[in-house]
């Protein structure tokens, strides 16, 4: 890359040879002390413990491979910091251990992370789930420390530990958060605060490494907070919190200030929260920027602050190296995004730890569905990828998921309603992973729809059924047509309805043709079209999160679109928990399981060709 020159190690040797001062302690004119700092970083890991297949036929991610690269980098730069910018959870089946085992934080401790911050997805289990996770992490750590305190422990002690906690993990990363705390009116405030204090969550900290005192703090962004509506936390102004932390850390002797921010960057300054933060606050040397899943090939430099992002899902380990002198002048020496791919060997200790997590998932979560982690459900002869950003067209994965919801409602829902017509809906924003060509497993199905937690307290949003008038159903189509260009996550995929729109027409008036369709689930997919009656009530099956978002359309469109989810009798829904679908055993019908069961029924025949190039659904002209 542009700034890749040579490692900090060789730079230090060269400077020492030229100026006869200790390595890393001179500048070009040999009059001011110069230090070299290396920061290794990730963000938005989303529980990607295991590698994922790529469209190119390779693999990306996996914590055992990440650990290998971390060790390799620290062999060259032993004083390097290792930090994370939040959203370390929610994205694979291992997240089902979040509240009970804290697998994410414990594994990050085993990989050598110094400090992390929290993101919106750490609150998918609500504020109480976050607190339970912290308590689980601390309990496991304390038990591990006690277990290892004496050289020879009885075998039964080790067996008892593993039965309760799984892997032995005596180290945890520091958890930093300076502007996000339980709201005063949160009824669980005392419990959450106690858990945070028990773990040792703090707003900022100093860390000495290689004779240098570093100051670190964590922040939650505006959009990130909005993406955590059930957190029960209150966010304070990021710039004010940052100024307070910088002042505190400087007072404690910090020479380099690092902000772990779950705020993100955007295409413009107005949408780039971390650029605004750097502009508003002096004294921050580095911002590790998470939330927007950005991959910055070069650091952004704003107000003498390096803003760095390595991309999501453990795709890369970021490495930033810069020199600095006692006058505060910095010089970028090296910036790399190191791929975590199939060419990297797995670190055996982390690979073994991950296998233990997989076994626990099978015992505690998948068993109730009669599935195993790597069980093959069916196969596909083609890739099904998540939608491209701001591309308004049919998508095979979106169509597959919406069909799966409708199929599950008809097949698995214990109380399937005998309604005149049902439409199923999913949204771009909840599709979290691709389905690559080849064998499709239970874990892959979960990865696609891994968000959220149900009213039963277990991972995965449940399906819900609500009712919309025909006019409101058309309004939902208009959301797709008009809002998607500025908010790609709003793109919708429907089964049981189709529509066409023209992006050159007026905003919120782009849909010009809409109809209901029969869905047969045979090779033809759909047949017969019916007119939508504006005044009739139509049943809509979707995920809990998508239903909640549909309920915000009126306020988000400033009243231009009216859409209010209803009960079958036409009264407005006041609690979506009343709309959850259940299977014959009384279990919540989860989004991911609807997809898994739909895939499984294709068996050895594999996915039909219609999902390779879906012709039904929306059409842009």
Stretch-by-stretch model annotation:
Residues 13-20, 83, 518, 560-565:
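Generic detector of low-complexity/intrinsically disordered segments
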Residues 26-343, 400-403:
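Acidic, metal/ion-coordinating pockets
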Residues 1-27:
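Gram-positive cell-envelope targeting signals
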Residues 17, 102, 306, 484-485:
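A short hydrophobic/aromatic micro-motif that marks alpha-helical segments and, especially, helix-coil
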């Amino acid at each position: 890359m542009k700034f890749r020159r040579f490692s900090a190690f060789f730079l230090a040797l060269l400077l020492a040879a030229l100026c006869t001062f200790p390595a890393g302690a001179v500048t070009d004119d040999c009059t001011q002390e110069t230090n070299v700092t290396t920061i290794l970083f990730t963000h938005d890991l989303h529980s990607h413990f295991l590698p994922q297949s790529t469209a190119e036929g390779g693999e990306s991610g996996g914590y055992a491979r990440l650990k290998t690269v971390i060790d390799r980098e620290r062999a060259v730069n032993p004083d390097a910091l290792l930090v994370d910018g939040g959203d370390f959870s929610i994205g694979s089946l291992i997240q089902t251990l979040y509240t009970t085992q804290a697998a994410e934080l414990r594994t990050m401790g085993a990989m050598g992370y110094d400090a992390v911050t929290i993101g919106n997805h750490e609150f998918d289990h609500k504020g109480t789930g976050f607190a339970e996770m912290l308590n689980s992490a601390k309990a496991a750590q304390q038990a591990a420390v006690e277990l290892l305190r004496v050289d020879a422990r009885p075998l039964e002690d080790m067996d008892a530990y593993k039965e309760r906690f799984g892997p032995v993990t005596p180290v945890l990363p520091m958890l930093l958060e300076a502007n996000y705390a339980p709201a005063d009116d949160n009824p669980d405030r005392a419990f959450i605060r106690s858990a945070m204090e028990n773990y040792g969550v703090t707003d900022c900290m100093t860390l000495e490494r290689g004779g240098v005192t570093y100051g670190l703090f964590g922040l939650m962004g505006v959009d990130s907070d909005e993406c955590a509506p059930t957190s029960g936390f209150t966010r304070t102004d990021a710039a004010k919190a940052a100024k307070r932390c910088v002042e505190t850390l400087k007072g404690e002797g910090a020479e380099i200030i690092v902000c772990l921010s779950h705020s993100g960057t955007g295409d413009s300054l107005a949408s780039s929260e971390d650029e605004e933060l750097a502009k508003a606050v002096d004294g921050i040397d580095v911002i590790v920027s998470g939330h927007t899943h950005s991959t910055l090939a070069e650091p952004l430099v704003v107000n003498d602050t390096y803003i760095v992002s390595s991309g999501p899902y453990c795709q890369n380990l970021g490495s930033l190296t810069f020199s600095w002198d006692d006058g505060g002048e910095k010089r970028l020496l090296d910036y790399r995004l190191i791929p975590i791919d199939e060419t990297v060997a797995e670190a055996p200790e982390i690979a073994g730890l991950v296998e233990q997590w997989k076994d626990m998932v099978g015992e505690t979560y998948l068993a109730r569905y009669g599935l195993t982690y790597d069980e093959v459900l069916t196969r596909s002869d083609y890739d099904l990828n998540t939608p491209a950003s701001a591309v308004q067209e049919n998508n095979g994965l979106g169509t597959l998921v919406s069909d799966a919801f409708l199929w599950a409602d008809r097949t698995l829902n214990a109380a399937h309603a005998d309604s005149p017509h049902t439409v199923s809906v999913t949204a771009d924003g909840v599709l979290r992973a691709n389905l690559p060509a080849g064998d499709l497993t239970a874990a892959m199905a979960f990865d696609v729809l891994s968000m959220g937690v149900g009213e039963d307290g277990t991972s995965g949003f449940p399906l819900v059924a609500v009712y919309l008038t025909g006019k409101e159903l058309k309004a939902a189509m208009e959301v797709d047509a008009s809002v998607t260009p500025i908010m790609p996550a709003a793109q919708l995929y429907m089964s049981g309805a189709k529509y066409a729109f023209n992006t050159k027409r007026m905003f919120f008036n782009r849909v010009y043709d809409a109809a209901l369709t029969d869905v047969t689930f045979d090779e033809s997919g759909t047949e017969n079209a019916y007119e939508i009656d504006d005044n009739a009530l139509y049943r809509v099956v979707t995920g809990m999160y998508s239903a909640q978002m549909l309920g915000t359309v009126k306020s988000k469109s400033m009243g231009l679109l009216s859409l209010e989810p209803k009960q079958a009798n036409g009264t407005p829904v006041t609690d979506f928990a009343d709309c959850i679908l259940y299977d014959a055993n009384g279990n919540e019908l989860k989004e991911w399981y609807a997809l898994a069961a739909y895939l499984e029924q294709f068996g050895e025949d594999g996915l039909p060709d219609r999902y390779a190039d879906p012709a039904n659904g929306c059409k842009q002209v």
